[in-house]
Structure formats: C-alpha cells, structure tokens
Amino acid sequence: MKPRIKVVTLGVSDLERSLIFYRDGLGLPTQGIIGTEFEEGAVVFFNMNDDLILALYPGHALDKDAKVPVSPPSPSDLSIGHIVGSKEEVDAIMQQAEIAGARVTDPARDRFWGGYSGYFQDLDGHLWEIAWNPAWEVKE
C-alpha cells in the first residue's frame, strides 16, 4: 500500500476562534466554515499544498465521530512541522503566530541537526514546529 495522507484534522474547542487564528493570524487561505447544514458537520479546510489539507473540526464532534472518549489534548503526542526556505522565514512565521495568540514554547534557534526551528502552540495547544533544514529543498 502506498500511503496517501491527504488530510490532517485538528480537534478544536471553538471553531470560529480557530478559524480567525489560522486565517487572519497566520494567513492561511480558506473558504471559511462549511458544512453547517449538517448536524455536527461544521468544518474548516485549508489547502496547504497540492497534497495536503489542514482541517479544523470541533473536538467534541471529532470524538463522537471517531467513537472515542472525550479527553484533554496532550501537546506532546504530535507536532506539525511546517518547513520553510530560510531562517528569516522561520522567524517571521514565529512572530506572526505569537501576534495571532500562539504560545511560543521554544523560540527559533539553531538546532543540533544543523537546521533552525522554533515551536509554538495554537489556541487549543496543538504543537507546531516551524523549521528550516539546509538539507531539504523547499518547492514553492
């Protein structure tokens, strides 16, 4: 089987607030909240690139949909890596996220593996790493 990960869905506590954070604060393009005509169907999609969609979905609805018990999020269970083309871009995105309300957990700095990165948590505690890796080419 060839893996085809297409959608990463984040369970959020307040869909409207998270939409504002990602759309207005981080500048991610979206059509906004869709699916409101369905019971517990409201969702937000962001096209991250040709192969990946970031989705925001109410956490209680995600728990119900997946038939798992409601539990508090653990930020150390997962981090989402956003790879950029330069150290300056890392710094700019980290600053943009902090202005939008993110909590910087580890400011951008040189890393032991030769790159440069920083971490922040979004409004629901989801952990993001913004990273530049000199060994990886970033295609625009």
Briefly describe each language-model feature range.
Residues 19-20, 64, 91, 106, ...:
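Alpha-helical elements of the RecA-like P-loop NTPase motor core of helicases
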Residues 4-14, 44-48, 67-140:
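Vicinal oxygen chelate
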Residues 9-61:
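Core segments of cupin and vicinal oxygen chelate
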Residues 57, 66-68, 140:
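Short, charged, solvent-exposed linker or helix-capping segments at domain edges/interfaces
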Residues 57-64, 133-135:
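Acetyl-CoA-dependent GNAT
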Residues 1-19, 37-39, 77-82, 134-140:
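N-terminal beta-strand motif that seeds the catalytic metal site of vicinal oxygen chelate
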